Swiss-Prot record:
Superkingdom of source: Bacteria
GO cellular component term of the entry, any: ribosome
PANTHER family: 39S RIBOSOMAL PROTEIN L28, MITOCHONDRIAL (PTHR13528), LARGE RIBOSOMAL SUBUNIT PROTEIN BL28M (PTHR13528:SF2)
Organism: Parasynechococcus marenigrum (strain WH8102)
This protein's UniProt keywords: Ribonucleoprotein, Ribosomal protein
MF-aspect GO terms: structural constituent of ribosome
A Pfam match: Ribosomal_L28
Gene3D superfamilies: Ribosomal protein L28/L24
UniProt similarity note: Belongs to the bacterial ribosomal protein bL28 family.
Segments forming a coiled coil: none
GO BP terms: translation
Full protein name: Large ribosomal subunit protein bL28
Length: 78
């Protein structure tokens, strides 16, 4: 399973690790993904999603149904 948020599509970021002597090496900054079982009120059922913690905060604020609708995601297919 790839490390991608199922709602926002967030992926790993390519960055640099910089040492004290300023030697730079490539590194991946992974998204903070969590497997969560979320209640979808409109569908009256639980939905298993792999989402970032940032998306979880937005879900708490807006609700799962309206947030998924604003992103153009059909939760019935998940």
């Amino acid at each position: 399973m790839s490390r991608v948020c199922q709602l926002t599509g967030t992926r790993a970021n390519n960055g640099m690790a910089v040492s004290h002597s300023h030697i730079r090496t490539k590194k991946l900054q992974q998204a903070n993904l969590q497997n969560r079982r979320l209640w979808w009120a409109e569908g009256k059922r639980w939905v298993n999603l792999r989402v970032t913690t940032r998306a979880l905060k937005t879900i708490q604020k807006k609700g799962l149904g309206p947030y998924a609708k604003s992103l153009g995601i059909n939760l019935a297919k998940l």
